[in-house]
Regions:
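Outer membrane beta-barrel
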Residues: 37-42, 63-67, 71-75, 81-199, ...
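Sec/Tat signal peptide C-region and signal peptidase I cleavage site
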Residues: 9-17
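Bacterial N-terminal signal peptides
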Residues: 2-10
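The canonical Cys-X-X-Cys-His
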Residues: 27-36
């Protein structure tokens, strides 16, 4: 039985859209999102890829068009955790076009860490052809689109954000310090990047492991389409203060697809990977997929359902996780200065010999 618990106020955020861009361009959240869901429209996806800017953008001197914030509380019914209500997170957002070619973006969780921060260069040739390069703390735009950019509730697919293999903490949608280059030509968008790997979760191993990723997307209508993903990285297993450590050379591959219409979106992905660890045989393996359907019966509500199935295999055996999640999201209000929504989300997760009923209350107010 699924038990719905919770509510979420969220902002019109491209993958967490922020009111500063609604103020700057004097547009509704539905310009970039299938509001009240976070699903990106063709305009929103192109806005994200270009560097949080529209074609031909330049600097805007009004500081209210460059800065925004949101406050977030969360309650997890499965664990009974109330820490977020007692100590809310505050996020500072800043960015947009700085010059004819340069733009920037910052998402700083004041309570914890900088979640994203990068400077971006974009050179345009017409409406649907441009080159772009970024440097800073970032993640592939393909993962941002199918992760937060697909959100209708408060959670991301397991294979993108939660499932890890043995002691390697890598998940595809995490952010890392690095650089990447990309470009759009008509319906195609490609991106390649080099990142500092993590030897300790959340701590960049500068000058040691360098991770590499590449993506390729085809979106005939600007948003519906398919995408390919590849990541190769390294990780040192063991205690860095008590060598020797074991080198973990790993790779992940994936295929993504979605079909979007004004009233619904069907999306999914399959990812596979292996970890080759010195002295450990056979190779450790991870695979998983998800399918999600969003529905938009009116301008004030979005409903959705998602199924996740992941499997990890190592020398200790195999672990399979299956999860079903449902939700409904309601618009509370929407203005250029502040926006809010309420989302209800519930799920059931099954692992060998056990199951857990899930419910999350997530409250976000953006201004």
């Amino acid at each position: 039985v699924l038990f719905a618990v919770g509510g979420a106020f969220a902002l019109c955020l491209p993958s967490a859209a922020v009111p500063m861009w609604a103020r700057r361009y004097n547009v509704a959240c539905s310009t970039c999102h299938n509001w009240p869901a976070f699903q990106l429209t063709a305009v929103g996806l192109d806005f994200l890829r270009r560097g949080h800017r529209l074609k031909g953008d330049g600097f805007d001197k009004d500081w209210t068009h460059l800065v925004a914030g949101h406050v977030e509380w969360e309650y997890d019914a499965a664990t009974g955790s109330t820490n977020q209500f007692n100590s809310p997170e505050f996020h500072l957002h800043a960015g947009g076009a700085l010059t004819e070619n340069f733009s920037g973006y910052l998402n700083a969780n004041v309570n914890n860490e900088i979640e994203a921060a990068y400077l971006q260069y974009t050179k345009e040739w017409g409406d649907d052809t441009y080159f772009t390069a970024r440097g800073g703390r970032l993640s592939p735009t393909l993962l941002r689109n199918y992760g937060n950019g697909l959100e209708a509730g408060a959670s991301d697919p397991l294979i993108l954000s939660d499932t890890t293999l043995n002691a390697n903490p890598f998940t595809p949608d995490r952010t890392n310090n690095g650089i990447d280059v990309g470009g759009r030509y008509q319906m195609f968008f490609a991106q390649v990047g080099v990142l500092n790997g993590d030897d300790v979760a959340g701590q960049a191993s500068v000058g040691h492991h360098k991770d590499f990723y590449a993506t390729l997307e085809a979106t005939p209508d600007g948003v519906s389409g398919v995408g390919l993903y590849y990541h190769h990285g390294g990780y040192d297993l063991g205690d860095p203060t008590a060598p020797p450590q074991l080198a973990d050379s790993y790779h992940r591959e994936g295929v993504f697809a979605n079909y979007s219409q004004p009233l619904f979106r069907i999306a999914g992905a399959y990812l596979y990977g292996q970890d080759h660890v010195a002295t450990v045989t056979p190779d450790r393996k991870i695979q998983g997929w998800y399918a999600q359907v969003n529905g938009y019966p009116s301008g004030w509500v979005a409903v959705w359902v998602r199924y996740d199935d992941t499997k990890t295999t190592d020398e200790t055996g195999q672990l399979r996780t299956r999860q079903g999640t449902v939700g409904a999201t309601f618009k509370v209000f929407e203005m250029n200065t502040t926006s809010a929504r309420i989302a209800l989300e519930a799920g059931r997760q099954e692992m060998p010999g056990t199951h857990t009923n899930l419910g999350v209350a997530n409250l976000i107010w953006a201004f």
